[in-house]
Amino acid sequence: MKKKVLALAAAITVVAPLQSVAFAHENDGGSKIKIVHRWSAEDKHKEGVNSHLWIVNRAIDIMSRNTTLVKQDRVAQLNEWRTELENGIYAADYENPYYDNSTFASHFYDPDNGKTYIPFAKQAKETGAKYFKLAGESYKNKDMKQAFFYLGLSLHYLGDVNQPMHAANFTNLSYPQGFHSKYENFVDTIKDNYKVTDGNGYWNWKGTNPEEWIHGAAVVAKQDYSGIVNDNTKDWFVKAAVSQEYADKWRAEVTPMTGKRLMDAQRVTAGYIQLWFDTYGDR
């Protein structure tokens, strides 16, 4: 989501200098750095610029391949209500209350302290679980449009904590400023290299409540944080402002761990969707 602008007074003082910086590793004709934090979600229905949607679609593909553990009418329902699901995935980044008045605080969750980056704000674990449960209530009431919209919201928050920066409260204003957004732009260019091609989701991975799953995903993601954000990648990112060589270096450095994260996210998401159906029953 390339428009996640922090509405904090402290952030406002940083926006002006950031806007004047262009990086050697830009692929869009020198567009400026923006204050953003997300897996990308630029278009409701286009995977190329919406890694949240890409992860969910790959998770549904995993479910479709597993005809032993996954009831295929569940896959059929996901496809039947795909528009509502995608609307929920997208709305999390573009509509209130989901994007928290442009602070996006609820899209972050550090599993070590249970908090987001803004004190006392709601975080991704409680927010994702909230919409998981609201989706289930709507499903039981046979309000399918609302059910799958809420499910899309919940999947967005789960997707966020699968990204190590979100699980470590590393925002786009963290040093080096702009690294968060440039990293996620880069992820969009390599994600198709890391499609899961089997039917092995993380079935029954955690307990029976969504909080455990979101927390567990954040724990694993944070363990991988140093493979993406470390002294080398930060130094190279800063130097990439004037050097394509260093842009290539930080990208190469983060690629292996990014691939691991993308594959884990697909499998966790498949299991999480299965948990939702297991919890609230089939239509």
UniProtKB/Swiss-Prot annotation:
Q: InterPro entries recorded for this chain? A: PLipase_C/P1_nuclease_dom_sf, PLPC/GPLD1, Zn_PLipaseC
Which molecular function terms from Gene Ontology are attached? phosphatidylcholine phospholipase C activity; zinc ion binding
Entry cofactor note text? Binds 3 Zn(2+) ions per subunit.
Which of this chain's residues are annotated to bind Zn(2+) 1? Answer: D93, H107, H156, D160
UniProt-annotated binding residues for Zn(2+) 3: W39, H52, D160
Q: Which reaction does it catalyse?
A: a 1,2-diacyl-sn-glycero-3-phosphocholine + H2O = phosphocholine + a 1,2-diacyl-sn-glycerol + H(+)
EC number, as in UniProt: 3.1.4.3
**One of this protein's GO BP terms?**
killing of cells of another organism
As given in the record, the signal peptide range reads 1-24
Q: What class of enzyme is it?
A: hydrolase
Domain annotation Zn-dependent PLC: ranges: 39-283
- Detail which positions bind Zn(2+) 2: H166, H180, E184
Q: Which Pfam families match?
A: Zn_dep_PLPC
Question: Which keywords does this Swiss-Prot/TrEMBL entry list?
Answer: Cytolysis, Hemolysis, Hydrolase, Metal-binding, Signal, Zinc, Zymogen
Q: Does the keyword DNA-binding apply?
A: no
Q: Which cofactor does it need?
A: Zn(2+)
Q: Which residues form the propeptide?
A: 25-38
Q: How does it assemble?
A: Monomer.
**What is the purpose of this protein?**
Required, with sphingomyelinase, to effect target cell lysis (hemolysis).
Q: Into which family does the record put it?
A: Belongs to the bacterial zinc-metallophospholipase C family.
Protein name per its UniProtKB record: Phospholipase C
Naturally occurring in which organism (per UniProt): Bacillus cereus
The gene that this protein is the product of is plc
